[in-house]
Amino acid sequence: ARKFLSTYGIPTVRTCTAESLADALSCANEIGYPIVLKIASPDIVFRQDVGGVFIGIDSDEALKAGYEKLMNRLAERQPGAVVRGVTIQKMIDVIDYELILGAKKDRQFGAAILFGMGGIGVEVFRDFSIGLPPLNQTLARLLMEETKVYQMLQGYRGKAPADLRQIEQIIVGFSNLIMDFPEIQAMDINPIAVSNGKAYALDARIILDRNEPAAGTAYPHLIITPYPTRYVSRWSLRDGTEVLLRPIKPEDEPLEHEMFTTLSAATLRERFYHPIKN
């Protein structure tokens, strides 16, 4: 999942998966202490529920003890789980805010994207909003503004404000990921940690749809068709001027307004069949 995130411009922290204690020690020394130790199992969705996460591990000795305790705890609490080792992740010292970004595909309605307060906050406070891909930065900001955590992200009780433009870009990148892969049934990034203004994806989960996407349709899993890039073309005028012809976008409104200000009253009247005052 983290490889997907990096490909779509969603920042993550240094992470590696280790199949043994020796591999875990090697990973930890390469990444650098302190680290977070997590169980790696496809059968465990919420690691905290089985005590599968240790934070603040700052030495080889602490890692050895944590590794042994983690394996014993898992054998006791979920003995049938398939264990693929552990995940070693560089620890972020101070987390100011936690966010969640998720998506789920409904067979009739299509894919929808969720944004809101992350960590345990998504279950306790249920502060989230829903949007439909594709999302641009304007729609991403509107998605953020519909949540209560948006006010906190602007600075709260001495905490640094989050880089809202970066979070917009993360949402847009996530939307592009969901658009490109109809095979994804559900996905969530939880939490997205905001530290000193910058956001990082700490954990991600992907569930694949076992059914084949509908044939003959470019985006069978979306209720809104993405921007038709196939109609974008470049042309040369007689004087050699290069022009770009493309379908209009919502964010073109300021440019359209600017164009209207250059037109005469007669041109506007012939275009709209009545005077345009504003």
Model-found features: residue ranges?
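ATP-dependent carboxylate/acyl-activation modules
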Residues: 1-275
